[in-house]
Amino acid sequence: MSKFKLKNLIRAIFKKEFKLNVNDQINNNNYTISENKISNKKYKIKIITSYDEGFNKVGNKTKETFKKYAEIQGYNFQNITMPNTGRPPAWNKIRILMDEMIKKEFEFLMWIDADAFFNNYNIDIANEIEQEKEIYMVKHYCEVHKGSIYQNTKLTILRINTGVLLMKNSEHNLKFLQKVWDKKEYINHQWCEQAAIMDLMDFKSELNGNLNDNKGNSYLEKVKFLSNDWNSIPSNLDLSTEKQDPIIIHLAGMKFKERIKYINTKLKL
């Protein structure tokens, strides 16, 4: 066999194997970020947020970006009065989403935490909607507390973030939210309702300390993981895994004064 034919044979084998490997990963890796399948349909979407009086200095500014995005994209927006459920405020998003779903006025509900704001108003969230998916959110690589045995290395794990949630108004999601609400063991957890969702979806590694217990379950069949553009947490690192010009910036984990300072510097209206 000539060298030319041998090279072509090797190239063909590699291309075939590479294609098989990629397909295998797509079919078996529930953490794959879905490709953007652009939808031409315009859905009835309601953007919602809620915060208490102690968060006014942040929420009163960020909500204006939600309102502006809704106006540009042709959606509805409401800043809902924080209900008195007796739980930490972060939990109330679950109660609010359930109450809004029961009304059946909108096809999709988009929750955004009050410590997040739109940075780019021109990209339609409806472009992310896929017929078989009902829950849309972002996941981030986060450093875990257990140290690595290797020098100059850190262990990271994928953690879901519920600061931005797009949910289809469906019976599946209403039942899911009720199960989240019923996870009372997480009422006072540092991640509140997010910890309950992590438990329900079998992302338990950061809840029980077992780093292998993060594989997910059948709930992921209805979940689409969006790119970090939709929920980008600022980093102090020069090289960040987050996007340089994201759609939504989420000031998760920041102190209140730092949030105000960041918003005054970065928020675009």
Model-derived segments and spans:
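Extracellular/periplasmic catalytic domains that process cell-envelope and extracellular macromolecules
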Residues: S39-K42, E128-Q131, T156-I160, L239-Q244
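Short acidic donor-binding/metal-coordinating loop in glycosyltransferase active sites
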Residues: M82, A114-A116, Y121
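Short beta-strand-to-loop acidic/aromatic patch adjacent to the donor-nucleotide binding site
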Residues: F106-D115
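Conserved donor-nucleotide/metal-binding helix-loop-beta segment in metal-dependent transferases, i.e.
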Residues: F118-I157
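Small-molecule pocket liners
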Residues: K133-E134, T162-V164, I247
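A recurrent flexible, glycine/aromatic-enriched loop bordering the glycosyltransferase active site
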Residues: N152-M167, H189
